Amino acid sequence: MDMRADVLIVGAGMVGSALALALQGSGLQVLLLDGSPLSVKPFDPAAAFEPRVSALSAASQRILERLGVWDGIVERRASPYGEMQVWDGSGTGQIHFSAASVHAEVLGHIVENRVVQDALLDRLHDCDLGLLASARLEQMRRSGDDWLLTLADGRKLRAPLVVAADGANSAVRRLTGTPTREWDYLHNAIVTSVRSSQPHQRTAWQRFTDTGPLAFLPLVRDGQEDWCSIVWSTTPAESERLMALDEEGFCRELERAFEGRLGTVLSADPRVCVPLRQRHAKRYVAEGLALIGDAAHVIHPLAGQGVNLGL
């Protein structure tokens, strides 16, 4: 017999999980499925930072507070910032944003995506929502007024509303033939965490260079404010050269590109290089179907705003 739900959310990432929690208490039978085990690892506050982070806005914080998730985030690790410094590498312009200018304590928080995800999963496991872990979607078609989904293990799911929250390479978007508008940015993003000789002053820094933007996003670990998450967007050829450098060579290149604003770059965690591609679904909704988060829109990581848009 087919499993049935009122709302079937495919993808338990940050946006899909947040939607599931938001629907709790609505009277709707909600089923959330994901290809991962949906397990939560014990958090080690002394552990290295995850390479992927988001700059959560005050609006996103309020959403996560209403969902009962925010405390679980700050108990793990969240780094507030109250200033932003942005400048042009050619010296022609700069801009400064301050939380004080809008009568706020902070502009936002830099948080590892894994931290947000685990805090959401903690709440999900405490709720009466239906969770299907390690469930891979294979087929999807209309069946009367419902969508009929077939999983890789042969199980069948049925729902009048399916929400695609399964990321940039959405299987739901592909299986439903939802068209997209997309193009390559012709840039790659190098992401890692680095330690500097000077504290970051709870400031988000961004320099626009001739080959692309370089961001230093403040991180706090064990009370130390000398760590930053960096996102360095540059050409494929330049990113290949930078990825080939040893740690010391990369730190020197990074220090020069950042004009030494935080002194010496002392160390860098292992780097990840991600090709950048814009992808935008031409429609977000269809009969019994909605696309959210990266399944609907993938943007440049310039300001770490993807999760904010999704929420």
Task: Describe each region flagged by the PLM.
Residues 15, 38, 169:
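Conserved Rossmann-like nucleotide-cofactor binding loop
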Residues 22, 119, 123, 193:
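Rossmann-fold NAD(P)-dependent oxidoreductase module
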